[in-house]
Regions:
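Acidic, Ser/Thr-rich low-complexity segments on the non-lumenal side of membrane proteins
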Residues: 55-80
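Cytosolic juxtamembrane regulatory segments of multi-pass membrane proteins
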Residues: 51-60, 163-166
Length: 166
């Protein structure tokens, strides 16, 4: 079957999943750029944090970690959206599954079991939405975990560079 036919048969559920996928991938592309630039500017970030610490004359480890956390939180923005897409898309696909099966049983109750295509049409929609939900969820789940791992590495690098400078 052609992809466009699957999208058409999946209805509003597949269209919602496509929109979520576009939004999620746009955020992941944006975050890839942000993480790339952040990794290249660890020295600059560490100097900014050290300048802030110099103003307060507070070089305690807790204050250093707090300042790093503030910088990291700005880099982290947008990752929750990726996590939400990874979590919600299988559920939305499951909603489509339930709707498809409901349509199948509704068709049977109106037309009987004489024509198997009536029943199979609803089941087909159910499976299309399930697959679409998983297709959206899996790369976003992988992307989210990759970014969280990268964020941890950036935080460790920042901490090391700052502690080396003090």
């Amino acid at each position: 079957m052609d992809l466009l036919i699957y999208i058409e048969r999946g209805g509003i559920i597949v269209n919602i999943l496509i929109l979520m996928n576009i939004i999620g991938f746009a955020i992941m592309i944006w975050k890839s750029f942000v993480f790339f630039m952040t990794n290249r500017s660890i020295e600059t970030l560490s100097n900014e944090i050290l300048d802030e610490l110099k103003l307060t004359q507070n070089y305690e480890l807790a204050q250093i970690k707090s300042s790093i956390s503030l910088k990291i939180s700005s880099i982290e923005s947008g990752l929750n959206t990726i996590k939400i897409i990874a979590s919600l898309s299988p559920l939305i696909g499951l909603l489509g599954t339930v709707i498809g099966i409901l349509n199948s049983f509704d068709s049977i109750s109106h037309l009987g079991l004489g024509d198997p295509t009536v029943f199979s049409s609803g089941i087909s929609i159910a499976l299309i939405t399930t697959v679409a939900g998983l297709i959206v969820a899996i790369p976003h789940y992988i992307g989210y975990n990759y970014f969280i791992g990268s964020l941890d590495k950036i935080e460790i690098k920042l901490e090391k560079v700052i502690l080396d400078k003090i």
